[in-house]
Amino acid sequence: MRSKKLWISLLFALTLIFTMAFSNMSAQAAGKSSTEKKYIVGFKQTMSAMSSAKKKDVISEKGGKVQKQFKYVNAAAATLDEKAVKELKKDPSVAYVEEDHIAHEYAQSVPYGISQIKAPALHSQGYTGSNVKVAVIDSGIDSSHPDLNVRGGASFVPSETNPYQDGSSHGTHVAGTIAALNNSIGVLGVAPSASLYAVKVLDSTGSGQYSWIINGIEWAISNNMDVINMSLGGPTGSTALKTVVDKAVSSGIVVAAAAGNEGSSGSTSTVGYPAKYPSTIAVGAVNSSNQRASFSSAGSELDVMAPGVSIQSTLPGGTYGAYNGTSMATPHVAGAAALILSKHPTWTNAQVRDRLESTATYLGNSFYYGKGLINVQAAAQ
């Protein structure tokens, strides 16, 4: 009897020890999982010849999970815990490890802007953006809208695979300002004959990972887009994002990006990314009287201004509405670039940018107005 009690006590003790150990292991595993975040791992240029499999191994060996390897950026999107981040930063083949930040649409705020930038003067000459491909890197475009001609696209939002559905309405509004058709309904776009491509990188809440945006820009490069419109941005810089934006520009694409809706903060720049990168055309917003919108971001990186207050444009479901924002100003510049290229198809993206900036109407201090309001009639001379 005494022996039996001893055996039961021993069995209970072993069970208790096992349970505590298992619980501790589970807690450690849960702790590890909870610290995992999304990152972009960049490899050194000297490692550009490294195979995709080897790059994947470098990350996997540290406990990371590779989500995507980029085409034009020597980097990969991955999920990492803190330990993996520290180990990868020490790896001799790794150049950088940066958080895969989230960008947001710069929403919101009528075609008065079309006349304000002198687009009708080009229309009357027969230049309306024909044969120019514009990638709208945004929340998708409602391709069923009767006032839009969407020629193609792709989605890089994992949970929203249809680029022709726009849950936030932002991308559809942007698309209308660029190229709403010259017909008997709705509104008129800056370049009504331009070909629109829906490149979805923002979800229905208007947010998207930087890695999704990088994928979208890579798609635009691979599919020979002439103009990229990015009415989006974030407060944090990214080596990978800058690399792919620079690649797009070196590939001959005109890249217009919204400066942001952060207003001004003394002498501190409030321009967001990717607009802050020198290779982009950073666009601020003015109203119908050419006064800077109070929300328009300011900074030395600002390049030009365009209408961005109460801009009437297309919305999903065949409807229309007015939004405010540098998001609404930027497509005026993208559309203007398409108009110029339809008149001067041999011009380089650098020439298009130079003409837009050098012919802009001076409005005031460049910190707040850049070179001024774009004048596409003058730019296309």
From Swiss-Prot:
Q: What class of enzyme is it?
A: hydrolase
Highest taxon listed in the record's lineage = Bacteria
Looking at the record, the residues that make up the Peptidase S8 domain are 111-380
The Swiss-Prot or TrEMBL record lists the needed cofactor(s) as: Ca(2+)
Ordered alphabetically, the record's keywords are: Autocatalytic cleavage, Calcium, Hydrolase, Metal-binding, Protease, Secreted, Serine protease, Signal, Sporulation, Zymogen
Q: How is the cofactor bound?
A: Binds 2 calcium ions per subunit.
User: Active site: which residues?
Assistant: D138, H170, S327
Q: Which GO terms describe its biological process?
A: proteolysis; sporulation resulting in formation of a cellular spore
Residue span(s) of domain Inhibitor I9 = 38-103
Q: Where in the cell is it found?
A: Secreted
List the PROSITE patterns. Answer: SUBTILASE, SUBTILASE_ASP, SUBTILASE_HIS, SUBTILASE_SER
Gene3D superfamilies per UniProt: Peptidase S8 propeptide/proteinase inhibitor I9 (3.30.70.80), Peptidase S8/S53 domain (3.40.50.200)
Q: Which InterPro entries match?
A: Peptidase_S8/S53_dom, Peptidase_S8/S53_dom_sf, Peptidase_S8_Asp-AS, Peptidase_S8_His-AS, Peptidase_S8_Ser-AS, Peptidase_S8_subtilisin-like, Peptidase_S8_subtilisin-rel, S8pro/Inhibitor_I9
Catalysed reactions, semicolon-separated: Hydrolysis of proteins with broad specificity for peptide bonds, and a preference for a large uncharged residue in P1. Hydrolyzes peptide amides
Q: Which residue positions does the secretion signal occupy?
A: 1-29
Q: Which GO terms describe its molecular function?
A: metal ion binding; serine-type endopeptidase activity
The record's comment on protein family reads: Belongs to the peptidase S8 family.
Q: What is known of its domains?
A: The propeptide functions as an intramolecular chaperone which is essential for the correct folding of the protease domain but is not required for enzymatic function of the folded protein. It is autoprocessed and degraded after completion of the folding process.
- Record-given protein name: Subtilisin E
Q: Which organism is it from?
A: Bacillus subtilis (strain 168)
